[in-house]
């Protein structure tokens, strides 16, 4: 079992289940996704494109993107993580979600559910935002202390968690995470890093544009 910050790993490539893309196909799909992201005209379009593209993979159960934002007192007061939160000044807000249950076919696209907000340091997602470190857990178990929904992990057969911080010039802007029903190798983390880097630049540019407009008013 591996539960660690992402790092280069060596070894034989695991057997590929039927329908799973080869590493070469994966890289080609990643490049194609980056080109499509460049054509998007808004952050929401980019987020939806990324989440839907990853969730369309046979092995992916859920793909999500959270943004790190300043919080408001009214939001904190009603947040289910209020008493676990270490910093009531900012938290992660779910900005994109796509996935499908293998149990009943339910599609996970809602942005206001149980995990629509994460406090810094809570679970793997919150830890990634707090530390700015990518995490690759390739033997996920429901009883792991960072798992916030053990029943979901068990029922959906989640085997791997891949999480990348969205970092621009040393500043964490959010978290990009994928929950897979198959074991993923280090190359999968590399591909996620490429997408995460583009996401971070897009977010930073959008924030800079918003700040410029605010100063002009």
How would you describe each model-predicted region?
Residues 1-45, 49, 56, 173, ...:
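Signal-transmission linkers at sensory-effector interfaces
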């Amino acid at each position: 079992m591996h539960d660690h910050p992402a790092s280069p790993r060596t070894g034989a490539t695991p057997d590929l289940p039927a329908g799973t893309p080869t590493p070469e196909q994966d890289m080609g799909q990643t490049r194609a996704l980056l080109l499509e992201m460049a054509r998007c005209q808004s952050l929401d379009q980019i987020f939806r494109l990324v989440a839907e593209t990853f969730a369309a993979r046979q092995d992916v159960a859920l793909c999500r993107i959270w943004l790190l934002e300043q919080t408001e007192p009214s939001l904190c007061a009603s947040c289910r993580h209020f008493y676990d939160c270490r910093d009531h000044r900012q938290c992660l807000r779910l900005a994109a979600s796509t996935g499908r249950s293998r149990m009943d076919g339910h599609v996970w696209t809602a942005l206001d559910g149980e995990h629509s907000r994460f406090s810094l340091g809570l679970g793997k997602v919150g830890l990634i935002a707090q530390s700015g470190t990518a995490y690759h857990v390739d033997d996920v178990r429901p009883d792991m202390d960072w798992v916030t929904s053990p029943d979901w992990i068990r029922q959906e057969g989640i085997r791997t968690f891949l999480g990348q911080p969205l970092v621009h010039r040393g500043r964490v802007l959010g978290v990009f995470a994928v929950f897979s029903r198959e074991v993923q190798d280090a190359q999968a983390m590399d591909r996620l890093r490429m997408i995460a880097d583009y996401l971070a630049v897009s977010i930073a540019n959008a924030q800079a544009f918003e700040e410029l407009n605010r100063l002009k008013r």
